[in-house]
A protein has these predicted regions:
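Feature for soluble, non-membrane regions of globular proteins
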Residues: 6-130
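Positively charged n-region of N-terminal signal peptides that target proteins for export
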Residues: 1-4
Length: 130
């Protein structure tokens, strides 16, 4: 089983910090180590700690993360569980050495249709971001 799937399964079942499948500096220069350290090491850790402090003695104590997010009413348990899930999915989607550098399939077709090429898309995207 790959690291991403294993980490996600462990996190969902036990409300633990997911293990990143890359070093904290592996995404530089796109995402800095400082950003990873702050958002992974502080934000996500705080949400995990909060959730683990909130669920004991509630109906959510033995439930997995997805079930908590799907069934908890608005409030602290729902918010922290949702943040754990969102942050985990965010961090686990990245790879320091992507297997492909350009989109494929329907996304590639839409980019080519709307921008002419992936290079043109990147130029326009970067210009719009400034």
């Amino acid at each position: 089983m790959n690291t991403l799937l294993m980490s996600l399964m462990i996190m969902i079942m036990s409300h633990e910090m997911p293990k990143l499948p890359y070093a904290n500096n592996a995404l530089e220069p796109v995402i800095s180590q400082q950003t990873i350290d702050y958002h992974y090491g502080k934000h996500l850790q705080t949400y995990v700690n909060n959730l683990n402090n909130l669920v004991p003695g509630t109906e959510y104590e033995k439930k997995d993360l997805v079930t908590i997010v799907a069934t908890a009413p608005d409030g602290a348990i729902f918010n922290n569980a949702g943040q754990v899930l969102n942050h985990t999915l965010y961090f686990l989607q990245f790879s320091p050495k992507p297997s492909q550098s350009e989109p494929t399939g329907k996304l590639a077709e839409a980019i080519k249709r709307d921008f002419g090429s992936f290079e043109n898309f990147k130029k326009e995207f970067n210009a719009a971001a400034r």
